């Protein structure tokens, strides 16, 4: 017995030698610790975050000897670790153009939850994005309980998000704090941001800062792209799945000199194979090609910084009835879906720091977008163009040298241009032509107060004027109170507004033959108040920490557009809420812990109660899950060579639009269903390979295309999707990155 014990002890010694740890402290230029700074071995998914004292410990790996240290609002730095026994002291300087500094912290590496900000915020890091195939933004929330992503119809492959039980139209989508996915882009824009391009994602619940506008009613999602100063000179990410979809991403960043750096990103996606798993004659997913290009520049000169980003995209989708159906029905007219999209967007940021001691700075952000979509859905043609121009000029300063009282104020201007043309026999007039030019100048001010780590307060107000809707005011209030280090309490309340775009907001109706009834020539501005409360407990369990959190958010609409699919099973009636009611209540509880070194687990459960007045009655909103359960677990071996990730989802049932009582073609409700995803990753020195599977339960919605045998008939409807359209899917991928030499 003793002999075997000694053999075990001595065989473990080499493992102990290789599992050396690097420790250090991350602080700002004033010496204050940065809580929640992300520490990552460059070119890998191996990382950690600093604790409440700015301290971190991370095990070494053969894959890299360069630590990438980043923190929201500060310049990312890279430190070469030659001697792991030396303690690192890293000092990060603030980025002058980044006026919204956000501090986040947690012990979980993948998803980092805020501890000391007033707004409830989660940061999905690069490590979390590597836990799944994550081909694009829409697939980045599989391990997140707060955000749902699902197909909006069974024919076009369009995906939309939901937060707090409501459509993603009420979530403000940002790209590096500039306008992102909105308007025409909301239907397919989630797929236009490749996972390999993203550095991190910040998810805020409830009404967020007024600095970025008035549109965040239920939350805000901000995407940070890879930065040219820190990303690898050349990195490749290739993926291939069992449905013969192939995707290649290439990224790179180069420092031209000490002041100027540039980065480039490329994506190509090809999906050329037809799939019809339920044999209804319709493709489960459209075929298509996508090319996506991005170029960005970063310039800094002492107190001045400038960023320029330009992106171009072309996406072509071809769906409808399969080739096999066409060959068997040569005498019939096939139902075709063809959607071609061209998009160009970008931004220019300028920032200048006048006084480093008080953080006095000015920032000017300009962005623009051009989006063109030409669509064919059977006998319906929908062609639309959107243009957007945005300008935000901000001034920021601290009232004191202790950085407790901060004021941010500024002016903004937003211009939206829409030109829509709809030709269909589903409109009473047969034709819909509308051009909209909306100008919205605004002014805002925001006060941010922090008292040690116990109290954070964010109070803001903005006033905007629209040439369509006149003057409107947006007050918002967020507070965090933490009397002890193990407990956080937050509360928020604020207003949110948006200008409705009835057709683009409900594009899934194009994949049906329901008659479209527009009760208004111009629909009222949507207005809502959102209030929420959340609490988090940090419970020490030996050397580990259990995080328990719970939150409840309530959204009440004063005005919104109602899509009535109940009054007539062959129509969709759009109307203002008027004197009706519409609200959404959302409760969520979550627990996360590192069970053993390298083994983490998260459990979450969410309940949603979403109702609105439909046809004169207050009813549950259709196609909305009543609950969601989530279990995620991740294990990384001691030498950081292997990583195993498993995610299980339990999606609650809900209500479907009322079927035709004389000829019911669908049920009045849908039941809950499970989904299971898993991935295994192996890390080499500068490369990694991953294999995984999605929807391993092979659950599929039965007959997602209603009336598929007669797609030009009145019963055809592919818009009532509540579950997966395709079954189990496997994939394999490869990541490679060249080490930076600077």
Regions found by a protein language model. Give the residues of each.
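C-terminal beta-signal and adjacent terminal beta-strands/loops
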Residues: 4, 597, 650-657, 681-742
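Short, acidic, small-residue-rich periplasmic hinge/interaction motif at the N-terminus
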Residues: 27, 37-42, 68-75, 84-130, ...
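Short acidic/polar hinge/loop motifs at secondary-structure boundaries
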Residues: 56-59, 160, 178-205, 293
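Extracytoplasmic beta-strand/coil segments of soluble accessory domains associated
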Residues: 59, 138-182
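N-terminal periplasmic accessory domains that precede
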Residues: 85-91, 137-140, 159-162, 174, ...
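Flexible loop and strand-edge segments within Gram-negative outer membrane beta-barrel domains
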Residues: 271-292, 300-362, 368-388
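Membrane-embedded beta-barrel scaffold of Gram-negative outer-membrane proteins
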Residues: 363-367, 371-375, 482, 488-490, ...
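Gram-negative outer-membrane beta-barrel transporters
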Residues: 450-454, 548, 552-556, 575-659, ...
